[in-house]
Amino acid sequence: MTTVVKHFLRDDDLTPAQQAEVLELAARLKKAPFAERPLEGPRGVGVIFEKNSTRTRFSFEMGIAQLGGHAIVVDGRSTQLGREETLQDTGRVLSRYVDAVVWRTFGQKRLEAMASGADVPIVNALSDEFHPCQVLADLQTLVERKGSLKGLKLTYLGDGANNMAHSLMLGGVTAGVDVTIASPEGFAPLPWVVEAARARAAETGATITLTGDPQTAVVGADALVTDTWTSMGQENDGLDRVGPFRPFQINEALLAKADADAVVLHCLPAHRGEEITDEVLDGPQSVVWDEAENRLHAQKALLVWLLAQRTGDRP
């Protein structure tokens, strides 16, 4: 048995070919939810939430059950994560109990520290910097609506420094999608993430565009994406997270500038009337409910794929 441990801490942890394999498997599992049962036994997956969650918790718990396994769910208050022992040591210990660890946490370095000691896959269920499982679901949704991903134009509008913008850049260009990030002054993506995304884009032929003009950013776009203007933990950061963002709201007028067949995505929860209007969120071009469902299928596919890397079995 091979013992390769593959983690999914950020979107570019998957090569373009590996990402395509996961998305293909996600489509298969959506049609046949119980076709893969690698956790039969049941075997366990540790699921740790240091940040509150609705979609992530429901989709991972149900997905693990459909894969034949048992989710051991804990929150940050009921563990000693990073307090009584190093995160590396925690990774070593948890590897003796479970087959994978799914962790929704704060700083990315916490995930990297645990992964450095773990002998089982560590999955980023959301960090301050990245939200890679969500972007797998977004890409699955785009495949369903658009077919091929390569060459699609995706425009994200909002806080360019949030985890969705970062993951859309990394995951999008990995799939060959041309990604535009439109954000107000002072809210651009972190430079080191842009550098990593441009490096991956150079491999796939995709492009990355950063702009402060939402009107030109959406012209001809195949997909518009937004997220809340105030992410968890930013409620009291002292920044004006309303006024500068108003021009970046996805409304019917802005959507009309995109391609006639453009789709609209939002990872949810949505602040209706802020980053997106009711008319767009509930309108015919919105695919947010399919996108939310696809969290289940994409995450199941990811777990199946990661577990197979350890055993050498092909899902």
From Swiss-Prot:
The keyword Plastid does not apply. Pathway: Amino-acid biosynthesis; L-arginine biosynthesis; L-arginine from L-ornithine and carbamoyl phosphate: step 1/3. Keywords: Amino-acid biosynthesis, Arginine biosynthesis, Cytoplasm, Transferase. Transmembrane segments: none annotated. GO terms for cellular component: cytoplasm. It catalyses: carbamoyl phosphate + L-ornithine = L-citrulline + phosphate + H(+). GO terms for biological process: arginine biosynthetic process via ornithine; citrulline biosynthetic process; L-arginine biosynthetic process. Pfam families: OTCace (PF00185), OTCace_N (PF02729). L-ornithine binds at N163, D227, S231, M232. PANTHER family: ORNITHINE CARBAMOYLTRANSFERASE, MITOCHONDRIAL, ORNITHINE TRANSCARBAMYLASE, MITOCHONDRIAL. Reversibly catalyzes the transfer of the carbamoyl group from carbamoyl phosphate (CP) to the N(epsilon) atom of ornithine (ORN) to produce L-citrulline. This is Ornithine carbamoyltransferase. It comes from Rhodococcus jostii (strain RHA1). The lineage of its organism: Bacteria, Bacillati, Actinomycetota, Actinomycetes, Mycobacteriales. The gene is argF.
